[in-house]
């Protein structure tokens, strides 16, 4: 069947085929007719080209290569029936706004068929688009176009034109002109210049020139002759080629030549005489600048006779090249591996790469696996790359130290080898203070002060630290300042050296900072007197680092001080002083600041004195004589900082006061005084400048003498023990430059001298007795305070410098203030036992008058068991001292008192919390949990309506809630001891529903309590829900932050070696490195959050507490989000579980975040909002949805949270904060559940005795050669994990849940029916990784 296809018109292809079928019986097809006749047509640029093709069959168009089919100006209509009886096909081509580059041959041809193949089935016309500005179709002005030529063959220079009338000249650089002669060189406006037999003369740069309307146009071409140059010959695979007997040998010889080069390729090989090889050749022309020839030699089933030298020969004309390769044929495989260097290798941290290589000889090529410390290296880090038999470590760090093993295996030969090398990563010493110091200018040290200089160094091997002293250079020239430089002569310091300042001590200690052991060197300067530079130099075999501490001593506060002697008056002298530290400032001068047109101008002050230089400072005094009012203004001392180059100003305002004549505020008046008495005369005068006051008696000037005292400024006259001679006229005179004023009075003395002496004796005795009394009282008080202050000083030093003294010794030194905490045993009535610890017990008691309360108070008493040892007594006493040190806080179980005196047991009295620990309380509330207060309120109303028996005195059934911890109310409430009253209180709280607000509140309170404990340098080390106690008014308190606990019977404590540890709550650094810090408490707080929002669920349910759990935790696996946690809460958990302790939030930050959540949950108000978890819709029941954590969920920062919700109009919201983008989180496997009771889910964490077997590693063993061996690189399967049971799902809010109306702002009543959320399912456990660092 004849196939017919038209690229332009699909619908008419079938019709064309049918028509052709009719003509195929013997009719001849006429060639297609074009609407433009002739072989060529000339049109102007910008005109529209219209061509119509009429034919007897379906046809298509062929266009010049410069015309794009996608050009919007081109339009081709598909062939359609036309002519008589519609037996012809017509198609049109329209090209709008034709351009010069549209010049070319346009062809209309029939679609190929069996009928038209033998005949001319096309019509063509050459269209010239004439453009005076573009005479050539292609312009090559900057870069000539390459034209390949072969001598003796035709060469075409394709400088085609857009008009047949353009005259073109062909020139050869530099001055030759090639003129067409009609034979050897001809011109064709459609093709260009045609050279029949090209010679070497046409090699070079040719250009075509045309002049149109007086403008010269050029297009350039570069001819290139074919050569015989062989660029390269290679054989693949490279030499040597190794094969096993019976394999196939394939050698590919590749010859690279220049274009237009032809080659002859041949082989020489051992079996050439017998033609052992088959050879095939091919040419690769895909390269634009070269030709590539291939000759492939192949020998099947190689034998020993095929080994030897194989040579590929390449020849092109007179050029010849060859390439050799050697072939080796082996009977069987082999492996040999040795150390290329030493078994223990060293490198340096910071290197861009390090190659760990082995000397391996093997055939065939073995499988290679590198292990680091027993695990695949490439899986541990992307920085590990396997290259051949080498392992390349990129960007070497200290984490790369360890044992590296290369595993080599040839499965088909059953050959296996391994070899281990140890890598030590050395670190150049690093001084951490040097990296964090960013002050532009050095600090100043007060004269005579005691200073402590520290230098924290890290390096491998451990660096040696020395302190050096560089004295300052003293310059006695007045033109230069003193300066200090580290290039001066340096001296090594020791505590006994007398260089520079007196050294109190030089000490070193090891400490763990940010998880690494660092050396802290401390230099204590006892008395800062001499300026200079202290250098801390640390060195090891890798290198040396030095930190220079410029030690500039100053006797000027802050190094810059300006003072004004006094505010001057008109006519007085203005005296200003400027003092700067001479090591920090220079170019000191006084200037006057003036404001002109809102711009501050600096005016220099003439006739300034020279600055004087002292030992530590430079002083510049400014004195202006006889000032006037115009001298008022802002005076500034300007000095240039030597290090920053910045001009520093210190300003002082000067206001020159106008002169004012003196005047008296009150005149003197006559006065009578008894003999032996005393009197005071006041003469208060004002004036500018301040007047000078002079006293006269009977016109004689009074001078100060015994019995006559002149007060400040002579304004008062005090006469002691008046005698008869003191009677007379007293006159005071106030004088300044504006004038004088005076006042006088007569002093009359009454009485006799005998009476005066008696009074004098009596007064003297009284004063002496009073003085002795106050002196004795002062000495007594100071003696009482002395011991207390000394103990307090020692105590503070212990707390503030914990690394100087061991922790147990610190606790032993802590003071115990018996006057504050001691409580009489006879006022304490012991009651029932609350629990027993490792060496103590806790009992409930009633304390009468504790904390100065006039009533009885229920408390908890911690005391030792019978037969306690001295060490146990010391431990409980240490706990008591710690509690006194920590202090009082609302969210901490507080100390109330203690009984330590002889004659009875040691007892520690703390607060009593009657509602037990938070873990059991949350478990008891699983069937009473509601999402918000509205649902909780409706739930209570529903219960009241369905439980009439309670109103008739029927006692409700309570879930059993036990507590093993000491508790008390957080509020100082005095009440009588009454168990019935306590039971009634608990009955009330047991009936109250638990809401989401309560869970957030518990989390917030615990964060506040831990923030307080961390501020008191207290690390809890066992923060869990079992150690959180619930008190009245929904207040939670942290306990057991120092109390002994019975870890031997508690299933939450797992044995590791000889120690039981709460592994589920412990941070990785605590498990593996025994490092406890506030950041490890933050990790435990994250697990506590999981307990709270799972309503008392046990962490990692169903996961066996073994070494596998620890390794998976270290690899980044985490728990899945608990049932009732919102995305914000779960994000906080992940933040707390960050692998790097430094990236975990501080408790202060957790308080802030949870405080925002709590406030938003209460007020339903905030900035940015997302749905919490309770959604009220108009047309759906009250539902609860657990957020699905996926990649999509975290993609847009919870912009579109994945909650099951209906309408979003009536949604309750909680204030949100930004989330970090999370990678896909690794999870624990989900486990099949087993049956268990709700209150026994903690028993899933049963104590697991962890032995000491190593973690599973990759090991290969060798056996006899004939034995079956294989390499198995799979990790051993994980141990079976204990499952969780299906928890019973009790009915919430009773069996039916009605629809709830949306809560509107103006509604005050809830719907008649409501529903709480279902209980959590703790059977599915998913492990999450911490967010990326």
Curated annotation (Swiss-Prot):
Q: How is it modified after translation?
A: N-glycosylated.
Residues at which ATP binds: 834-842, 862
Q: Which reaction is catalysed here?
A: L-tyrosyl-[protein] + ATP = O-phospho-L-tyrosyl-[protein] + ADP + H(+)
Query: What does UniProt give as GO cellular component?
Result: endosome; extracellular space; nucleus; plasma membrane; receptor complex
Which compartments is it annotated to reside in?
Cell membrane; Endosome
Report residues carrying sugar chains.
101, 165, 197, 252, 324, 418, 475, 517, 598, 626, 667, 714
Q: What are the boundaries of the signal sequence?
A: 1-22
| Catalytic residues (UniProt) | 1022 (proton acceptor)
Matching entries from InterPro entries are given as: Ig-like_dom (IPR007110), Ig-like_dom_sf (IPR036179), Ig-like_fold (IPR013783), Ig_I-set (IPR013098), Ig_sub (IPR003599), Ig_sub2 (IPR003598), Immunoglobulin_dom (IPR013151), Kinase-like_dom_sf (IPR011009)
Q: So which stretches are on the Cytoplasmic side?
A: 782-1333
Known SMART domains for this protein? IG, IGc2, TyrKc
Q: How is its activity regulated?
A: Present in an inactive conformation in the absence of bound ligand. Binding of VEGFA, VEGFB or PGF leads to dimerization and activation by autophosphorylation on tyrosine residues.
Membrane-crossing segments per the record? 760-781
Record carries keyword Calcium: no
Q: Which cysteines are joined by disulfide bonds?
A: 53-108, 159-208, 253-312, 455-536, 578-637, 683-732
Q: For bias kind Low complexity, which ranges apply? A: 960-970
Which GO biological-process labels does this protein carry? angiogenesis; blood vessel morphogenesis; branching involved in blood vessel morphogenesis; cell differentiation; cell migration; chemotaxis; embryonic morphogenesis; hyaloid vascular plexus regression
Where does the Ig-like C2-type domain lie?
A: 32-124, 152-215, 231-328, 334-429, 430-550, 557-656, 662-748
Q: What does this protein do?
A: Tyrosine-protein kinase that acts as a cell-surface receptor for VEGFA, VEGFB and PGF, and plays an essential role in the development of embryonic vasculature, the regulation of angiogenesis, cell survival, cell migration, macrophage function, chemotaxis, and cancer cell invasion. Acts as a positive regulator of postnatal retinal hyaloid vessel regression. May play an essential role as a negative regulator of embryonic angiogenesis by inhibiting excessive proliferation of endothelial cells. Can promote endothelial cell proliferation, survival and angiogenesis in adulthood.
How would you summarize the oligomeric state and partners of this protein?
A: Interacts with VEGFA, VEGFB and PGF. Monomer in the absence of bound VEGFA, VEGFB or PGF. Homodimer in the presence of bound VEGFA, VEGFB and PGF. Can also form a heterodimer with KDR. Interacts (tyrosine phosphorylated) with CBL, CRK, GRB2, NCK1, PIK3R1, PLCG, PSEN1 and PTPN11. Probably interacts with PTPRB. Interacts with RACK1. Identified in a complex with CBL and CD2AP.
Protein's recorded name:
Vascular endothelial growth factor receptor 1
Native source organism of the sequence: Mus musculus
């Amino acid at each position: 069947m004849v196939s017919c296809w038209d690229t332009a018109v699909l619908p008419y292809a079938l019709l064309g085929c049918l028509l052709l079928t009719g003509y195929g019986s013997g009719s001849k097809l006429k060639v297609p007719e074009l609407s433009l006749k002739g072989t060529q047509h000339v049109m102007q640029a910008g005109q529209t080209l219209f061509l119509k093709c009429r034919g007897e069959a379906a046809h298509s168009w062929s266009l010049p290569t410069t015309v794009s089919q996608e050009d919007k100006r081109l339009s081709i209509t598909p062939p359609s029936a036309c002519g008589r009886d519609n037996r012809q096909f017509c198609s049109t081509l329209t090209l709008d706004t034709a351009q010069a580059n549209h010049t070319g041959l346009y062809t209309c041809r029939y679609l190929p068929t069996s009928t038209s193949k033998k005949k001319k089935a096309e019509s063509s016309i050459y269209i010239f688009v004439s453009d005076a500005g573009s005479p050539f179709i292609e312009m090559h002005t900057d870069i000539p176009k390459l034209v390949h030529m072969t001598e003796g063959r035709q060469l075409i220079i394709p400088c085609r034109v857009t008009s047949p009338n353009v005259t073109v000249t062909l020139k050869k650089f530099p001055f030759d002109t090639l003129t067409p002669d009609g034979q050897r060189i001809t011109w064709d406006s459609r093709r260009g210049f045609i050279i029949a037999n090209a010679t070497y003369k046409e090699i070079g740069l040719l250009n075509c020139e045309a002049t149109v309307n007086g403008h010269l146009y050029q297009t350039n071409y570069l001819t290139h002759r074919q050569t015989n140059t062989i660029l390269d010959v290679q054989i693949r695979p490279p030499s040597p080629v190794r094969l096993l007997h019976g394999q196939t040998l394939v050698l590919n010889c590749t010859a690279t030549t220049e274009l237009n080069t032809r080659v002859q390729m041949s082989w020489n090989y051992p079996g050439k005489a017998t033609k052992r090889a088959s050879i095939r050749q091919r040419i690769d022309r895909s390269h634009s600048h070269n030709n590539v020839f291939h000759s492939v030699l192949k020998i099947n089933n190689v034998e020993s006779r095929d080994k030897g030298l194989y040579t590929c020969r390449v020849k092109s004309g007179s050029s010849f090249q060859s390439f050799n390769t050697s072939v080796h044929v082996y009977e069987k495989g082999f492996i040999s591996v040795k150390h290329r260097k030493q078994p223990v290798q060293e490198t340096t941290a910071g290197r861009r790469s390090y190659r760990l290589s082995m000397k391996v000889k093997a055939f065939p090529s073995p499988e290679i696996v590198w292990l680091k410390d027993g695990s695949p290296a490439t899986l541990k880090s992307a920085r590990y790359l396997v290259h051949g038999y080498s392992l390349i470590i990129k960007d070497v760090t200290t984490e790369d130290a360890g044992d590296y093993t290369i595993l080599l295996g040839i499965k088909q030969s059953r050959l296996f080898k391994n070899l281990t090398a140890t890598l030590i990563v050395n670190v150049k010493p690093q001084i951490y203070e040097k990296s964090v110091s960013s002050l532009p200018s050095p600090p100043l040290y007060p004269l005579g002060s005691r200073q402590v200089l520290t230098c924290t160094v890290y390096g491998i091997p451990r660096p040696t630290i020395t302190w050096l002293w560089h004295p300052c250079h003293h310059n006695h020239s007045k033109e230069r300042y003193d300066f200090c430089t580290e290039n001066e002569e340096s001296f090594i310091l020791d505590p006994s050296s007398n260089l520079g300042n007196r050294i109190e001590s030089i000490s070193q200690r090891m400490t763990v900072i940010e998880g690494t052991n660092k050396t802290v060197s401390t230099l204590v300067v006892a008395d800062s007197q001499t300026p200079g530079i202290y250098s801390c130099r640390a060195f090891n075999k890798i290198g040396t680092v030095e930190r220079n501490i410029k030690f500039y001593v100053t006797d000027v506060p802050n190094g810059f001080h300006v003072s004004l002697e006094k505010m001057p008056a008109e006519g007085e002298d203005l005296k200003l002083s400027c003092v700067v530290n001479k090591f920090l400032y220079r170019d000191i001068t006084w200037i006057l600041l003036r404001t002109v047109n809102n711009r501050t101008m600096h005016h220099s002050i003439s006739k300034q004195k020279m600055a004087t230089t002292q030992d530590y400072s430079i002083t510049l005094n400014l004195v202006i004589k006889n000032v006037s009012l115009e001298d008022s203004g802002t005076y500034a001392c300007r000095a240039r900082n030597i290090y920053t180059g910045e001009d520093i100003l210190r300003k002082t305002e000067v206001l020159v006061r106008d002169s004012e004549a003196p005047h008296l505020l009150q005149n003197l008046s006559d006065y009578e005084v008894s003999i032996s008495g005393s009197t005071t005369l006041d003469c208060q005068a004002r004036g500018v400048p301040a007047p000078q006051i002079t006293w006269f008696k009977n016109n004689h000037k009074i001078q100060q003498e015994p019995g006559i005292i002149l007060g400040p400024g002579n304004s008062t006259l005090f006469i002691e023990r008046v005698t008869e001679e003191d009677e007379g006229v007293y006159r005071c005179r106030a004088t300044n430059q504006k004038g004088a004023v005076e006042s006088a009075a007569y002093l009359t003395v009454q009485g006799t001298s005998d009476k005066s002496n008696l009074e004098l004796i009596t007064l003297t005795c009284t004063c002496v007795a009073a003085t002795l009394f106050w002196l004795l009282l002062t000495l007594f008080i100071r003696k009482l305070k002395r011991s207390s202050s000394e103990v307090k000083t020692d105590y503070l030093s212990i707390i503030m410098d914990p690394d100087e003294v061991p922790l147990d010794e610190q606790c032993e030194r802590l003071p115990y203030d018996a006057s504050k905490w001691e409580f009489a045993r006879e006022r304490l009535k012991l009651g029932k036992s609350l629990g027993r610890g490792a060496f103590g017990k806790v009992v409930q008691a009633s304390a009468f008058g504790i904390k100065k309360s006039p009533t009885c108070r229920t408390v908890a008493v911690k005391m030792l068991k019978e037969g306690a040892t001295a060490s146990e007594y010391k431990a409980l006493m240490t706990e008591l001292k710690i509690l006194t040190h920590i202090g009082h806080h609302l969210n901490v179980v507080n100390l109330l008192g203690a009984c330590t005196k002889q004659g009875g047991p040691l007892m520690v009295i703390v607060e009593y919390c009657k509602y037990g620990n938070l873990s059991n309380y949350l478990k008891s509330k699983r069937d009473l949990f509601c999402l918000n207060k509205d649902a909780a309120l409706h739930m209570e109303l529903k219960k009241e309506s369905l439980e009439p028996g309670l109103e008739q005195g029927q006692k409700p059934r309570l879930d059993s809630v036990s507590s093993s911890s000491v508790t008390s109310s957080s509020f100082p409430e005095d009440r009588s001891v009454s168990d019935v009253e306590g039971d009634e209180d608990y009955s009330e709280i047991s009936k109250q529903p638990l809401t989401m607000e309560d869970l957030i509140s518990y989390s917030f309170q615990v964060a506040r309590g831990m923030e307080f404990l961390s501020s008191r340098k207290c690390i809890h080390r066992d923060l869990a829900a079992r150690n959180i106690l619930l008190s009245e008014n929904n207040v939670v308190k942290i306990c057991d932050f120092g109390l002994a606990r019975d870890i031997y019977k508690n299933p939450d404590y797992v044995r590791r070696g000889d120690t039981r540890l709460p592994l589920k709550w412990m941070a990785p650094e605590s498990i593996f490195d025994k490092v406890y810090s506030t950041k490890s408490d933050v990790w435990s707080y994250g697990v506590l959050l999981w307990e709270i929002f799972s309503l008392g669920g046990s962490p990692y349910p169903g996961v066996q507490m073994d070494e596998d759990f620890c390794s998976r935790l270290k690899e980044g696996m985490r728990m899945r989000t608990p049932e009732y946690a919102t995305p914000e809460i779960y994000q906080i958990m992940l933040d707390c579980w960050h692998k790097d302790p430094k990236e975990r939030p501080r408790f202060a930050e957790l308080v802030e975040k949870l405080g925002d959540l709590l406030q938003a949950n209460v007020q339903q108000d905030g900035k940015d909002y997302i749905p919490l978890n309770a959604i009220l819709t108009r047309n759906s029941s009250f539902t609860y949805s657990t957020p699905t954590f996926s990649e999509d969920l975290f993609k847009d920062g919870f912009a579109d949270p994945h909650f099951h919700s209906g309408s979003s109009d009536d949604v309750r919201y909680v204030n949100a904060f930004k989330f970090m983008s999370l990678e896909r989180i690794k999870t624990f496997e989900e486990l099949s559940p087993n049956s268990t009771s709700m209150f026994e889910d903690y028993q899933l964490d049963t104590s697991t005795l962890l032995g000491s077997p190593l973690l599973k590693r990759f090991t290969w063993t060798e056996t006899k050669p004939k034995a079956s061996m294989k390499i198995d690189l799979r990790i051993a399967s994980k141990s079976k994990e204990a499952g969780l049971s299906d928890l019973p799902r009790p009915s919430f809010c009773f069996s039916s849940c009605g629809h709830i109306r949306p809560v509107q702002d103006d509604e005050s009543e809830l719907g008649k029916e409501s529903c709480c959320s279902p209980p959590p399912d703790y059977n599915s456990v998913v492990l999450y990784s911490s967010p990326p660092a």
